[in-house]
Amino acid sequence: MATYYGKKYKLLELKHLFKELLLTTKIAFKSKELGKPKTKSPIYVAMIDGEAYHGGMCDRFKGIISLYAYCKYLGKPFRIKYTYPFKLEDYLQPAAYDWTLKRGEYTDNPLYIRVLYMRGEHLATRLFNLRAKRQIHFYSNRDLLEHINKTYAKEGTGRRPFNWGELFCELFKPGTILQERIEATKESIGGDYYAAVFRFQNLLGDFPEYRYRPLNDKDKEEELITKCLDAVKTLMAKHGNMALLVTADSMKFLKRVSQIDGVHIIPGTLTHMDGQKHHTQGNQFETYLKSFLDFYMLSEAQKVYRIGTPQMYHSAFPVFAAKMHDIPFESITI
């Protein structure tokens, strides 16, 4: 997604004001939750409900953590409504902070809510300017933490800036099934490991995502795969005998790279979480579980590498996985 500045950014904000009106009306029209919320003060709800484009898993976490940081600074009650294309509680549970919606807290009634749609906005200005006394439904796919920290943890405030990983771990811990898979995967690897992440974004034709087109050329596909395999071998020579975990969005590539001695992969299929539900085959629970498993396994590596050609996508997924426990991260262009 492009990042806008100046007049273009102001136009984006204006466009989003109209989007907010449309969302408010559309959601209320089909909602069965229109009662007056039973809360002492308005709650702030991070929305992942399928009513707008949310992005992939990492983009969703960016928006969630941004709103949580804002609420934590100001003492606002924070909740998450994550229902698309699955319920977040199927994979993650509340850790130190309970973000789950309680009976009677939530409403879609326009009399009691204010939709704040900030998809693509890299500044938290409109969030700072909120004066609403209504329940806030927040849509965002950007990491606003730096801007929020600079605003509320200025020198002289006595506040320290928040760390992305600490906020994530305050909110989330793996559910029972996810935790079991994490332990089983770590046992399979057998010790410390480092990780390499490759994001082909459908270049190899096996990961439908939005309108990204495959190469559709067997020779070019093989050239790209070989280049990435060579990068893996170069990386392994640098790290000696330590195990290497490789994650990617292409099953073609994972099948090839798994043939290299010392490389570990996480079995299973992948799908993009936003708008790709019709491409998800087989057991959907297992398919989405793999994304969470990849994320948590990356977060516990000794170091995470993002590797790709200029044509490949420089995903933020490994960047934020590394942020969870503040482990070293390096991006390599080949």
Region spans (language model):
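Boundary detector for helix-to-coil junctions that initiate low-complexity/charged tails
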Residues: M1-L11
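Acidic carboxylate-rich catalytic motifs and surrounding loops in phosphoryl-/glycosyl-chemistry enzymes
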Residues: F78-P85, A243-M251, T333-I334
